[in-house]
Amino acid sequence: MPELSPKIVGLMSTKLDDGLGMFEFLIGSNEEVLLSYKSVRDRLIVTNKKLLIIDVQGVTGRKKEYMVLPYSKLTGFSCESAGTFDMDAELKVWASAINQVEFQFLKGTD
């Protein structure tokens, strides 16, 4: 299996139900969306059970790749806050069978 290292940049907070139709089928009945972030095309959804990454591809945006990372499969993480001259903060997570996934949040994002 090839090692994956996806990187989602330019994330900013959105309403919890923003784009719900795009990922609702991946949310379980006893699962709650806690945080929602969106870049120009991609999304990061944080639930009480997993991280859900949506990578929108292609010119029309019809092609989407969904990556689900259950918390039970995470093996490590790293956080870097935005500094005086930095425009973003970073969160890196490592999971079983995945090298790392990196998220870059715009400065001022909660």
What residues fall within each predicted segment?
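Phosphoinositide-binding peripheral membrane targeting modules
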Residues: 26-43, 47-100
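Anionic N-terminal interaction surfaces
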Residues: 1-45, 108
